Amino acid sequence: MRCMTDSAPAEILEPAAPPAPGAEQYPALDLANSAMALPGGHTLDLLATPADAGHWLTGHGLAPADAGLREVCAAQLRSLREQIRALIASRVDGHPAPASALAAVNEAMTKAPAAALLHWDATRGLHRASAHPTTQILEHALAALAADAAELLTGADAERLTACGSPPCTRYLLRHGRRQWCSVRCGDRARAARAYARRTGRDDA
């Protein structure tokens, strides 16, 4: 099944917030944060449409800029996002990892061939290269993101994973020192909420 169309890419929209700390290092963390809750009950999904999903993949070096993404495959990317979020949430909350999320991430890691095979041609001679036909662009992207999530969740940075401490934000980040906000905006909102609670006597801390 082809995931790519021949349609031209649409205009890239700017995200509502800068990447959370750690998201530039771990694309899987940025994927987990690609759907976010905004003040006033609003939400933003950076993978809402096939064009949005294609732009996100292109921006992370996981798809060519001149390829479009079909909805069925954009849905697969959104599904992997939810499974990675479930694993991050279980890690942050200290709960057992959901079996369905483990299975989905493991399947994504093994769906595309990861080995760089040997090839020979007159120009380059003997060399290694990974198969990456157009029909497998999404599979390779999902495999890369799943492997990145596994590294994040089991590596040295796993202890620094935390949820943004400024409701209604639902993003995750890698904690630096005592900071537990994903952005300056969330930090300002949390400080303003604490100041308001102190003024009105509603501080439960």
Report residues per predicted region.
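Cysteine-rich micro-motifs
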Residues: 177-188
